[in-house]
């Protein structure tokens, strides 16, 4: 069954194991998420739980949103997300989901929004090779051939310059190194997408090895 939690990326650091091995880790702060709704097949057509993360001011919420969170006896939430394929019997409206849903050694999938890089060329955006930089060359960082002459057009999905970053990306099969319940912190091995303070979704790995 799937377990999941929403959190905030704090940054990267490194820790040492008992054997002296250095492990780079990403620190994710996940304050308690609140279950706002439990969806069932009878009422909604599918099974899922809806969780809210990070309080926001009531003046920024409309009446339907306030009424929705009032059932869970909590404040309006800035981020709301559903997790499917969960054990519904373990959840009820108003229950808090804390970082202890995961343990050290668990394998998880982490989703975040990558850093926006703005308008970039084909070399930086797609990793293409550049031309010779020596004297006499007129081809340095250009995109190269746009395609054959015959169709008289540029095919769709041709790798050209454009906006880079700001994409929703999931990295699979990352290991949970440590869980600090007192500080509401999860340490995940390696790097994860997104800038500092960005929203991160952590859930059980779909393709766990």
Curated annotation (Swiss-Prot):
**What are the start and end residues of every segment in region (Disordered)?**
118-151
Which GO terms fall under biological process for this protein? translation
Write one Gene Ontology MF term. Answer: rRNA binding
Q: Which residues cross the membrane?
A: none
Q: Does the keyword rRNA-binding apply?
A: yes
Q: Which Gene3D superfamilies match?
A: 3.30.160.810, Translation factors
Tell me the keywords, alphabetical order: Ribonucleoprotein, Ribosomal protein, RNA-binding, rRNA-binding
Q: Which GO terms describe its cellular component?
A: cytosolic large ribosomal subunit
Instruction: Indicate the family of this protein.
Output: Belongs to the universal ribosomal protein uL3 family.
Its biological purpose: One of the primary rRNA binding proteins, it binds directly near the 3'-end of the 23S rRNA, where it nucleates assembly of the 50S subunit.
NCBIfam families under this entry? Answer: L3_bact (TIGR03625)
Subunit field text: Part of the 50S ribosomal subunit. Forms a cluster with proteins L14 and L19.
Q: What's the protein called, per UniProt? A: Large ribosomal subunit protein uL3
**Organism of derivation:** Enterococcus faecalis (strain ATCC 700802 / V583)
